[in-house]
Amino acid sequence: MSQVAPKWYQSEDVPAPKQTRKTARPQKLRASLVPGTVLILLAGRFRGKRVVYLKNLEDNTLLVSGPFKVNGVPLRRVNARYVIATSTKVNVSGVDVSKFNVEYFAREKSSKSKKSEAEFFNESQPKKEIKAERVADQKSVDAALLSEIKKTPLLKQYLAASFSLKNGDRPHLLKF
């Protein structure tokens, strides 16, 4: 059976969409980002803080911790674009980070209910309670990290100090 000709032709040619050859691949981290590296956070609530990099998560974020006891930075996810890796390293082989994954950091769904106008205007935001499980996890990671940090003189003070640029500092010439 031969091809049947179409009943009509379009007056103008319609260009076919260009085929894309892109595929989703896991992000390749910088060579300087290895677990145990001390990082400087560049953005967010804890910008300027020095933290210890623990592991890479499935969603291409980095798991870092202050430790909380030293500089107040809890276990959290950070985008690799917003960190500077320093040459300082901490041994993190004794830290158990196997339980931390993307689901661990997911927010709980809050039930949205209809509010009256009076409740809307006099409502104060309730203080968010931190789960006891999260506190226990933070303490266990901090204990393991602090035992390693204490082995290096002045490392605890280094992590507690925040990073900032002064007048005349040239970031492209600094050795981190």
UniProtKB/Swiss-Prot annotation:
GO cellular component: cell surface; cytosolic large ribosomal subunit; membrane; preribosome
Transmembrane segments: none
Sections of the chain in a coiled coil: none
Molecular functions (GO terms): RNA binding; structural constituent of ribosome
Disulfide bonds: none
UniProt protein name: Large ribosomal subunit protein eL6
Organism of derivation: Candida albicans (strain SC5314 / ATCC MYA-2876)
Cell location: Cytoplasm
Keyword field contains Ribosomal protein: yes
SUPFAM superfamilies registered for this protein in UniProt: Translation proteins SH3-like domain
Function: Component of the ribosome, a large ribonucleoprotein complex responsible for the synthesis of proteins in the cell. The small ribosomal subunit (SSU) binds messenger RNAs (mRNAs) and translates the encoded message by selecting cognate aminoacyl-transfer RNA (tRNA) molecules. The large subunit (LSU) contains the ribosomal catalytic site termed the peptidyl transferase center (PTC), which catalyzes the formation of peptide bonds, thereby polymerizing the amino acids delivered by tRNAs into a polypeptide chain.
Keywords: Cytoplasm, Ribonucleoprotein, Ribosomal protein
